[in-house]
Amino acid sequence: LIVKMLMRRVKFFRTEWFRKREAAIFMLGAAILFVIVIGIARNASSTSHFFTMAAGLLIEFALLLIAVLTSLLIRHSSKQINYGMRIYTPIMLMGLLVITFRIIFIPNSLIALVFPPLLVVFGFWQWASIHRNGPKVPKSDNSYAIASFVVTAITFAISIVGYSLLGLQVYIWWIFQLTVLQLIVACDDLLKQYRHKRVDILVRAYRLKHQNDVGKDKGSFILVTWLYDLVEMVLIPVLYLLSIPFCLYMASEVFDLTEICMDMFFYPFFNYEY
């Protein structure tokens, strides 16, 4: 009711930009509202350990969904946004099922029975989604969707040989990894927009002001591009690298395996004595 009233009275909600992104924006708003409501309920009933655990996992998933939707809204045009949502739907729904397995403490024997068929169903869905929507989204999203299909196939292979819990861990790690990659790519896209709108203008102004002192190489404009170059060449690659251990830790936290994860991080694999 509130949304309908806003759409009638606020001009922004009647613009073409909003209408073509309406589904993604509504989903984003619903996810944010869900996080707020569940967060308040979690703090209000802190005596129930089960509810606290379940609410925490659901909030984590909602935050992942918020990150993916935000990235799509930043990077995709009005013609691409719906296709982008469809191409990520299978992997996110399967991730919700995996988190549900953790919340309800489904027995290991039942996981071994149910998980592989679910992977087959969602794997075919992912492949069909890539085939239908892949050509209509940016290449990076198509690549991530293909990687999601490959991870699904690897998880199925792990599960079918009897390591279903390891398969769950691998799958939930990829969902965290995919989400962080989406955020980094979105930041990189915003950085490129900043370059076109601001840095290129500064470079042209600097070139006109110092015509006799500036060469043709890129390093000649370091005084005006140093911050952009620092973020683009150093910070973004470092974020990609650090995202791997971070996502491994977050995935291990879902299944209370953080102690094992930290032991692996700090294990002296190369311990040479002179």
Where do the model's predicted regions map?
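Hydrophobic/aromatic interaction determinants used to assemble and anchor large protein complexes
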Residues: 1-274
